[in-house]
Amino acid sequence: MRILRVPTDFRVVEQFDEAMLSRQGEHLVYSVSSRGLNTAESAARLADAAGVPMDSVSYAGQKPKEGVAGQVFSVHGGEPISMRGFEFVARRIGVADRPVQASDITGNAYEIVVRDLQGDDMRRLRHNMAQVRDGGLPSYFDDQR
């Protein structure tokens, strides 16, 4: 069995509570999809594009460089932006009167591709996935924790 053979074999997307969005605010809120970039690198791209210092960019959680990540950022001040490229897409989803923070994320959705299953792998995988479904799984990846 092989996991994470190619970058798109791992996807994680933050589940965002849109209740923090407001009708007015100084913080522009973006949905960002990145590939091959960690959270700090994505934040730097947003800061550069908006013309603001890095400390004007906030995010709820750390995402790894490996794989494809979907996460929410807020930018205090600066120019509204929209970016679309192979490894980075930023789309404004609203405004807020405060920066995005960890409590704005209700969880993460994962997609992990498993390749080259052999023998008893599928039976074990189904058994283990049932345990994950029933009990959850802590998220320990890269330098997050």
Predicted regions and their residues:
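Ser/Thr-Pro-rich, acidic low-complexity intrinsically disordered regions of eukaryotic RNA-binding
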Residues: 39-45
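Extended, charged/glycine-rich binding lobes that contact polyanionic ligands
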Residues: 1-23, 27, 35-37, 49-50, ...
